[in-house]
């Protein structure tokens, strides 16, 4: 009897172990014939591996795809080709994707410290319509970035600027004598750039966006170019310039319609767009994520063409912690929704709304059951009551993909004042996230540090903002230009350190912390945009180390507290900002300020 019991127990244990094992499948990319540090094109191999995984794995299984540590090269040839409409990017299609993950569940991509290097014009990684997925332990870079890094070697007021391209920059002087960057399948002409101090990698003081005209350029020696029309006394020899264009076709990582995603120890060293763009996703965690250089000895000065991370129309909770964001050409993080402009009132329950910005359209805006509210664009005041969508369909084409206009029917009657003539926007309140931004370092970047536009709880704590060049923290809201929603109702900014922000001027940069909704007609505004309660925005226990005056600018706020903060003044730069006030407030009520 004892033998039978032992056998039964052994059988039960073996079945349990095999059941657990069956719940997790582990694949190694080397199984598919791709080895680390080989010159083999990884794009078609990874595409086939993902297809095999999808075919073999059962619903509910945990799946791990591992890459043995090393370098993997992804080319356009053999990549996945998709039509993607990506918020705040160029809507040019099709897109070529190196690692396309779609309709996945419980998938982990583990790079084990690998470098994923891309060529041409590609989206390195996409993750769409997926649940419970993890991306971890890899970096993203391009062999030939579309930004051309050059160093000023001579600056003659009469003869112009002479510069040397960085060793990795391939270039040519065109037939019409223009400096052009070259890469696999692309040619770039550069209209403007950002200047970095050659020693500190800070954005050069009081330069902002600089023009870099190279018409008439010629080589004076191998890899040494004189540009007679490029004259700028601020660019002393040794200055490094990141030459760039206006385009932003491809983020490093594109996420859409995902639920519960984690990005752990992932680094983006370059992308011709944002480092990470997530739209219409729920619950995202970034831990140890970086848009950064490859350490202190990296010869590059720049990272991404636009924001480091960007979250458009997401919900749930966005957590971004322990990250490093440096050298990017825009904000470290931007969280917002998108206003649709009312272009037609069909009846008392139906409106036609339109995506207005040329880089934000073509993707889903809302669903039946979503809560919405309406705003008057001129004064950014809410009008009427909150409402609910009962039906929504694309209006200018037959499907959501690529649509710019939507017919939306609401549960309750729409306020009679809302029409297509006076300027009104529709805001989706359901697709708004809670945000925790903590323990991050933001440094040496263009424009601003962080930007938040969400009514849900937002906590910004224990971060280092080091020479962000513009405003360190911006609370915005705009139904006139960018059309990025919305009002902030519950914001805590605490235990952060700010070192010499505002060395340059960019949009909305009125102080180190700038609460700046875009309100064309502020004088006729009766209500307030941000806040709405006592302590709606609290700024406390921070340290400001600054060379200039403006610490806090606020416009149209009800409920603002500034307390227990330390302000130190240094002489590292000459004060130049037009705002000479420590605290400049416009239409702010219910405010308490004490250093």
Curated annotation (Swiss-Prot):
The Gene Ontology terms for molecular function here are: alpha-galactosidase activity
> Which keywords has UniProt assigned to this entry?
Glycosidase, Hydrolase, Repeat, Signal
This protein's superkingdom?
A: Bacteria
The species is Bacteroides fragilis (strain YCH46)
- Which N-terminal stretch is annotated as signal sequence? 1-22
The chemistry this enzyme catalyses reads: Hydrolysis of terminal, non-reducing branched (1->3)-alpha-D-galactosidic residues, producing free D-galactose; Hydrolysis of terminal, non-reducing linear (1->3)-alpha-D-galactosidic residues, producing free D-galactose; Hydrolysis of terminal, non-reducing alpha-D-galactose residues in alpha-D-galactosides, including galactose oligosaccharides, galactomannans and galactolipids
Give the protein's function. Answer: Alpha-galactosidase. Removes both branched alpha-1,3-linked galactose residues of blood group B antigens and linear alpha-1,3-linked galactose structures.
EC number in record: 3.2.1.n1, 3.2.1.n2, 3.2.1.22
Q: Which InterPro entries match?
A: Beta-barrel_GLAA-B_II, Pectin_lyas_fold, Pectin_lyase_fold/virulence
Q: What is this protein's record name? A: Alpha-1,3-galactosidase B
UniProt record similarity statement: Belongs to the glycosyl hydrolase 110 family. B subfamily.
Stored SUPFAM superfamilies: Pectin lyase-like (SSF51126)
- Cite the repeat ranges for PbH1: 432-454, 455-477, 488-541
Fetch the Gene3D superfamilies from UniProt.
Single-stranded right-handed beta-helix, Pectin lyase-like
Query: Gene symbol?
Result: glaB
């Amino acid at each position: 009897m004892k033998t039978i019991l032992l056998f039964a127990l052994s059988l039960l244990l073996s079945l349990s172990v095999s059941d657990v094992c069956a719940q997790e499948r582990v694949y190694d990319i080397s199984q598919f014939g791709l080895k680390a540090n080989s010159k083999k094109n990884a794009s078609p191999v990874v595409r086939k591996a993902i297809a095999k995984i999808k075919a073999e794995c059962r619903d509910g299984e945990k799946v791990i795809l591992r890459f043995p540590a090393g370098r993997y090269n992804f080319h356009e040839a053999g990549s996945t080709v998709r039509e993607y409409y990506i918020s705040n990017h160029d809507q040019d299609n099709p897109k070529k994707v190196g690692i396309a993950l779609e309709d996945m569940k419980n998938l982990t991509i583990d790079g084990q410290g690998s470098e994923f290097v891309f060529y041409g014009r590609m989206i390195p990684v996409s993750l769409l319509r997926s649940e419970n997925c993890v991306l971890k332990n890899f970096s993203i870079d391009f062999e030939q970035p579309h930004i051309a890094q050059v160093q000023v070697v001579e600056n003659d007021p009469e003869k112009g600027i002479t510069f040397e391209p960085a060793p990795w920059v391939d270039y040519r002087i065109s037939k019409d004598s223009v400096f052009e960057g070259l890469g696999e399948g692309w040619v770039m002409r550069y209209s403007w750039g950002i200047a970095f101090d050659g020693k500190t990698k800070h954005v050069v003081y009081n330069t902002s966006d600089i023009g870099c005209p190279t018409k008439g350029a010629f080589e004076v020696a191998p890899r040494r170019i004189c540009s007679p029309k490029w004259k700028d006394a601020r660019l002393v020899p040794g200055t490094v310039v990141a030459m760039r264009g206006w385009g932003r076709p491809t983020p490093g990582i594109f996420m859409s319609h995902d639920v519960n995603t984690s990005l752990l120890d992932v680094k983006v060293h370059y992308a011709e767009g944002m480092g990470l763009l997530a739209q219409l996703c729920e619950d995202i965690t970034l831990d140890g994520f970086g848009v950064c250089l490859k350490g202190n000895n990296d010869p590059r000065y720049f990272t991404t063409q636009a924001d480091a991370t960007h979250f458009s129309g997401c919900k749930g909770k966005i957590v971004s912690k322990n990250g490093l964001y440096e050298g990017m050409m825009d904000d470290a993080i931007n969280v917002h929704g998108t206003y649709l402009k009312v272009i037609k009132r069909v009846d008392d329950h139906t409106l036609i709304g339109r995506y207005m910005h040329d880089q934000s359209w073509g993707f889903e805006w809302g669903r039946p059951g979503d809560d919405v509210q309406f705003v008057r664009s001129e004064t950014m005041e809410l009008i009427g009551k909150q409402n609910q969508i009962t039906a929504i369909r694309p209006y200018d084409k037959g499907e959501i993909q690529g649509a710019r206009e939507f017919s939306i029917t609401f549960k309750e009657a729409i306020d009679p004042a809302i029409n297509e003539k006076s300027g009104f926007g529709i805001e989706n309140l359901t697709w708004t996230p809670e945000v925790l931004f903590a323990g991050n370092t933001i440094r040496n970047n263009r424009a601003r540090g962080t930007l938040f536009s969400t009514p849900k709880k937002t906590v910004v704590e224990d971060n280092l903002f080091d020479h962000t060049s513009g405003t360190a923290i911006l609370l915005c809201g705009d139904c006139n230009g960018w059309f990025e929603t919305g009002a902030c109702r519950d914001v805590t900014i605490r235990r952060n350190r700010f070192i010499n922000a505002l060395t340059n001027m960019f949009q909305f940069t009125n102080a180190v912390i700038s609460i700046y909704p875009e309100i064309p007609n502020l004088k006729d505004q009766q209500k307030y945009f941000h806040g709405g309660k006592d302590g709606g925005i609290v700024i406390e226990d921070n340290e400001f180390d600054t060379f200039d005056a403006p610490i806090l600018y606020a416009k149209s706020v009800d409920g603002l507290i500034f307390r227990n903060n330390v302000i130190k003044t240094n002489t590292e730069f000459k004060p130049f900002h037009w705002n000479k006030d420590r605290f400049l407030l416009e239409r702010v009520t219910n405010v308490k300020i004490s250093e």
